[in-house]
């Protein structure tokens, strides 16, 4: 009878952190978590983000109603209504719920859509899921720390990524370069 060989898949030149622990966790999760397990951690250049868990009622108490609707009810603000569309200063855009930095101003571009748009994000700051609420499936993205809905990503952006992260302005807070970032919400 052939024996099974234990192999830890990894990206070339990048070892998977905590190999033995990762294998045990992956076996219990059906190997579905392998890409994420090897993408972050020691040697990856991406810091692990500790999730911020709050109930919907807690978020409702902390946020103005229009921000809560977008961030935790997956609402969308009207196109052209966000002052962040015109923001051109150097700085960072952070999640309006938990204050995790999501985008740098150097990635912002005018997409002509009426929403703040970015060609790339800070590594590890966003997660995605499929959104089937319209006739055509879309990819929704949200803050990796608090799960707050930010917007949708499309393949009609500018080089070098070709991506357009189309963000609700109310889901972001702009922090000008040289000013301290807000402390992460606890």
Residue ranges of model-derived segments:
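N-terminal secretory signal peptides that target proteins for export/translocation
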Residues: 1-17
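A short Gly-Trp-Pro
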Residues: 50-51, 60-94, 99-186
């Amino acid at each position: 009878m052939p024996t099974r060989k234990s192999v830890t898949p990894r990206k070339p030149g990048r070892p998977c952190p905590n190999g033995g622990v990762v294998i045990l966790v992956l076996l219990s999760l059906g190997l579905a978590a392998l890409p994420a397990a090897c993408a972050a951690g020691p040697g990856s250049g991406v810091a692990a983000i500790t999730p911020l868990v709050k109930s919907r009622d807690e978020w409702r108490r902390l946020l103005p109603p229009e921000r809560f609707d977008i961030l935790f009810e997956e609402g969308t603000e009207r196109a052209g209504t966000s002052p962040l569309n015109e923001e051109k200063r150097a700085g960072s855009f952070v999640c309006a719920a938990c204050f995790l930095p999501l985008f740098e101003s150097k990635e912002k571009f005018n997409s002509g859509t009426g929403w703040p748009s970015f060609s790339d994000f800070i590594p590890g700051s966003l997660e995605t899921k499929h959104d089937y609420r319209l006739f055509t499936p879309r990819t929704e993205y949200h803050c990796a720390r608090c799960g707050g809905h930010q917007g949708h990503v499309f393949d009609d952006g500018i080089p070098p990524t070709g991506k357009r992260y189309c963000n609700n302005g109310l889901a972001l807070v702009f922090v000008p370069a040289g000013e301290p970032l807000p402390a992460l919400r606890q």
